[in-house]
From Swiss-Prot:
GO terms for molecular function: intramolecular oxidoreductase activity, interconverting aldoses and ketoses; L-ribulose-5-phosphate 3-epimerase activity. HAMAP family: UlaE (MF_01951). Induction: Induced by L-ascorbate. Repressed by UlaR. It catalyses: L-ribulose 5-phosphate = L-xylulose 5-phosphate. Keywords: Isomerase. The keyword Cell inner membrane does not apply. This is L-ribulose-5-phosphate 3-epimerase UlaE. The keyword Lyase does not apply. PANTHER family: ISOMERASE (PTHR43489), L-RIBULOSE-5-PHOSPHATE 3-EPIMERASE ULAE (PTHR43489:SF8). Catalyzes the isomerization of L-xylulose-5-phosphate to L-ribulose-5-phosphate. Is involved in the anaerobic L-ascorbate utilization. Belongs to the L-ribulose-5-phosphate 3-epimerase family.
Amino acid sequence: MLSKQIPLGIYEKALPAGECWLERLQLAKTLGFDFVEMSVDETDERLSRLDWSREQRLALVNAIVETGVRVPSMCLSAHRRFPLGSEDDAVRAQGLEIMRKAIQFAQDVGIRVIQLAGYDVYYQEANNETRRRFRDGLKESVEMASRAQVTLAMEIMDYPLMNSISKALGYAHYLNNPWFQLYPDIGNLSAWDNDVQMELQAGIGHIVAVHVKDTKPGVFKNVPFGEGVVDFERCFETLKQSGYCGPYLIEMWSETAEDPAAEVAKARDWVKARMAKAGMVEAA
């Protein structure tokens, strides 16, 4: 029987940098986490993972089996550099190829959810044409994901196009495909002028995972827990009361800190204390 404990994971970029996944998963286990979320960002180093050999992919699978710590999700932020909404056909084609490779990678190693960045373009000016291309790119991506039985899940972003669950639901309704769902970030959601509790309730039935971090208006990264605007207890209460039973992922960027493990342990204890206050006793 599967445990009723709330699945709590940690973002790869919170842990010491490096390419040894056995060491990373062992550390995550020592720190009390159930899973680690992989990052495939716009750097050449992390993008190269999508070209891993069969042996490299098998090494990741073996590390998961050996440690018992899962890698069920991928944060695919590489589309900042190669956006699906780009008006440059070559750049957009690269974005679609990255999506194809990411879906194949996920299928090979057992990743179930690929979190998408909700940017039509990031470094360029957005317009109606970039949004149209983005929609068409998502449609093509979801078709690929459907064939592979891999879920694509849209993050609620630090960007106006996708800064609320309501906006992301518009894309879910447009695509009308069970392999496209939502992956809200309660930090990003809280940093905008949103009714956070109503937004979370609106997403129930489409939320496959939740990012946990603190933010301030206009500051979306590296805000210490408890120093931002997020009402964690209310968010956890709302999700619990709405029937959400899925995973929570602590998102941090402490991989270059003096002692990443200590930073992560401190954040873990802080988050679990708020979960306990919200009545999520399994996380206490």
